[in-house]
């Protein structure tokens, strides 16, 4: 059956967005929800996506049964992992058609209108995608422990490590390192206990403080941003070579 509606979902590690249109592309409704990383927390991510689907259909003034007349494309963080793809094969929302790809693939397609090019998403985590006109090549996206070069989570981790070094007088202190340690009552043990449950988003929460400190002339903060810029440059050079087209930077850290 020919679908009557088109639904796109951009599911990132911090939040997800949905947009419902008719077949002519006229927007009927748009909604946002919580994180939708199917690698980090598969069940919670799909619960969030399911709630978002219901919300955007309702906001369009349609009955939920309209989903059976809707073609759905979901770009979800973590959907590039093979084991996750196997689980997603059993996800069957009540829609007319379904395609699930990674969030970075839909970002690349949207940024360049289907033409050759690449994107590097630098938010809480990071991942790149290059489209050469025939196929996508993905770079990174292997999680906070192994990957996420240039990301907010990695920047936050470096900053807190630096703060701990300064606290123990291994390197000089600065306004930034003192400010960061103050959040843990200047206690390395408190910091250690926090790391047990800290998510990538938790690590990334100190990023605004780093930028503010760098603007104020804090040398440690400026060094941290230089390291992050070098990481981003490394990824961008490879993406440029893969796509032979322009590279778009996206995500929270790419915002001026």
Regions from the language model: what does each represent?
Residues 1-67, 110-116, 160-256:
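ATP-binding/phosphotransfer module of carbohydrate and carboxylate kinases, centering on a glycine-rich
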Residues 73-80, 122-124, 244-254:
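Glycine-rich beta-strand-to-loop/alpha-helix junction loops that act as flexible
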Residues 76-173:
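Phosphate-binding/catalytic loop of phosphoryl-transfer enzymes
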């Amino acid at each position: 059956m020919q679908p009557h509606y088109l639904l796109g979902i951009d599911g990132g590690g911090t939040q997800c967005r949905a947009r419902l249109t008719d077949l002519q592309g006229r927007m009927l409704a748009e909604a946002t929800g919580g994180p939708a990383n199917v690698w980090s927390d598969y069940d919670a991510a799909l619960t969030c996506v399911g709630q978002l689907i219901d919300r955007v259909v309702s906001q369009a003034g349609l009955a939920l049964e309209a989903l059976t007349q809707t073609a759905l494309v979901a770009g979800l963080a973590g959907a590039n992992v093979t084991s996750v793809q196997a689980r997603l094969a059993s996800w069957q929302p009540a829609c007319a058609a379904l395609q699930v790809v990674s969030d970075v693939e839909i970002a690349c397609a949207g940024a360049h209108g289907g033409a050759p090019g690449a994107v590097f998403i630098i938010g809480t985590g990071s991942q790149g995608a290059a489209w050469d006109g025939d196929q996508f090549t993905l770079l990174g996206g292997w999680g906070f422990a192994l990957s996420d070069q240039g990301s907010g989570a990695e920047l936050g981790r470096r900053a807190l490590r630096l703060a701990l070094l300064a606290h123990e007088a291994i390197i000089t202190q600065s306004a930034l390192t003192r400010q960061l340690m103050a959040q843990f009552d200047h206690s390395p043990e408190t910091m250690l206990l926090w790391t047990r449950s800290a998510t990538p988003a938790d690590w990334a929460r100190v990023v605004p403080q780093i930028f503010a400190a760098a603007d104020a002339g804090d040398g440690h903060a400026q060094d941290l941003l230089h390291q992050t810029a070098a990481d981003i440059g490394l990824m961008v050079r490879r993406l440029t070579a893969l796509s032979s087209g322009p590279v778009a930077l996206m995500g929270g850290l790419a915002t001026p």
